[in-house]
């Protein structure tokens, strides 16, 4: 069984820029919201090779990413040199001092079982400053793959041993962000074309602010 680091290292080694170079639809939505709320600095946990960070850094934001794969970090430094990228796990974000106005996280939270999801969000809380905004996307229960594999926790399935995917209902997502004040939630249809197959993910997003 691969560790998380080994899994992502192999994937980025084998497939390079897996999801192409264009940012996700949700990153564009987050960009509009961050501008509206006066955000200046953004943390991107699970930043990959920089396809989403580059949208923010090229739009004038001060951007920091954290990514577990060495290969992805190296790709990001070439693809998006304006973003600072730290190599490490999102479950331990003690990579440097300072806090951020906002966090943007694309399709990372659902890759963990419940205890680690809670830990991840606590790590995020510790990295948010006074503005304290967060925009997360996750797999929804409307995903075509929902229910496939071995159920290891409620609404969490392993497509292969050690690779959990949690599928969020809206109620579940809001509950995970109970230490935040929810501003907006919704569904976003995110098209992807990798592995030779075009498909669309049905994601939930939440835009929230750290509770005072």
Can you say where each PLM-predicted feature lies in the sequence?
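Short catalytic micro-motifs in class I SAM-dependent methyltransferases
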Residues: 107-111
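Class I (Rossmann-like) S-adenosyl-L-methionine-dependent methyltransferase catalytic domain
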Residues: 1-43, 48-95, 112, 116-119, ...
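A short glycine-rich, Lys/Arg-flanked "PGG" loop and its adjoining helix->strand segment in the class I
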Residues: 118-130
